[in-house]
Curated annotation (Swiss-Prot):
It is found in: Nucleus; Chromosome. One of its GO terms (molecular function) is protein heterodimerization activity. Its main location: nucleus. PROSITE patterns: HISTONE_H3_2. Keywords: Chromosome, DNA-binding, Nucleosome core, Nucleus. It comes from Mastigamoeba balamuthi. This is Histone H3.
């Protein structure tokens, strides 16, 4: 990469320069090779980025093996020694994730209606009650 010459840029405001007296009051010089603080994004920035990322994607968000164990555990209550095709578990997972995404969309609308941005258990209960899933 070729090096380029730096040109001076006009300042666009920001903090006012500190007085020279304040720098002389310091007893020790700052460390030359100090530890650099890790970069942190402002609150909400990463959340918005994740929302956009997951809205674009179509892959399943629940891990396959834990979901498979859960399905088998629930099926044990109805009949022992049940066997599942892999396509059956994939279909169950697809349906379960679609249901959860829809429920969270409705839950978010309930929270927004209550003039909040944070979803709460009462929002999920209201969304399910409006849907007619729970009386």
């Amino acid at each position: 990469m070729a090096r380029t010459k730096q040109t001076a840029r006009k300042s666009t405001g920001g903090k006012a320069p500190r007085k020279a007296v304040a720098t002389k009051a310091r007893k020790t010089a700052p460390p030359v090779g100090g530890v650099k603080k890790p970069h942190r994004f402002r609150p909400g920035t990463v959340a918005l980025r994740e929302i956009r990322r997951y809205q674009k994607s179509t892959e399943l968000l629940i891990r396959k093996l834990p979901f498979q164990r859960l399905v088998r555990e629930i099926a044990q209550d109805f009949k022992t020694d049940l066997r599942f095709q892999s396509a059956a578990i994939a279909a169950l997972q697809e349906a379960a994730e679609a249901y959860l995404v829809g429920l969270f969309e409705d839950t978010n609308l309930c929270a927004i209606h209550a003039k909040r941005v944070t979803i709460m258990p009462k929002d999920i209960q209201l969304a399910r009650r409006i849907r007619g899933e729970r009386a």
